[in-house]
Amino acid sequence: NIEPLPIEQKLKESIFINQVMVVGQDKKTLGALIVPDFEKLEDYTRETGIEYASRDGLLEHPTVKNLYRTELKSLISPKNGFRTVEYIPTFRLLSKEFEIGMELTQTLKIRRNVITEVYGEHIASMYR
């Protein structure tokens, strides 16, 4: 069994990740729902010359997806004490932050059951 909390805590060390929830503990591979740090991500797009029409367009941009893929690989690695089964090969970038009273408790803990329900289609798409 894989404990998601240490993985999520490590991923939040990235300047580009604001919120994250690991999914797929019952699947062959893990996945992640990631809420980017949009301020840092927009700084990155200015520096690299990425053009986009909307926030959703930004999140689908191949360069942005590669940035997050690289972040996941470097953070969840054996050099950081993670096992290969804890690597996250698939993820979805979300355009909306998790909110207190909805996806988060008053103490900012993730409500996994709520997020799984709200983002069920995103999660399912990672395993098709």
Features from the language model and the residues they span:
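Conserved C-terminal "lid"/linker of ANL adenylate-forming enzymes
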Residues: 19, 69, 73-128
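AMP-binding/adenylate-forming catalytic core of the ANL superfamily
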Residues: 1-86, 100
